[in-house]
């Protein structure tokens, strides 16, 4: 079993990410959708990304984020128990799920359990 505590080099791009992870749940903005997530991501990526892969990511992001949350990641929650979301980057709607300012660390610790 991999132990987080035994890891000597804990710096990585994922570890240092503070903003959050995007998924179009529509918990705060009911108009949000995987289609809008696709558009925001594809356009903000200067249309460099493979549209088919960006579409898959936008469609599957909610189920992946829910799965990580169910494994014990410490995402912020609304009073109704749903994931809280905030604006981040150039996205049209609040879709960034976060764990304070330590989202990357929270996700990595969860995945390494």
Task: Enumerate the predicted regions with their spans.
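Conserved N-terminal/central alpha/beta ligand/cofactor-binding core
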Residues: 4-113
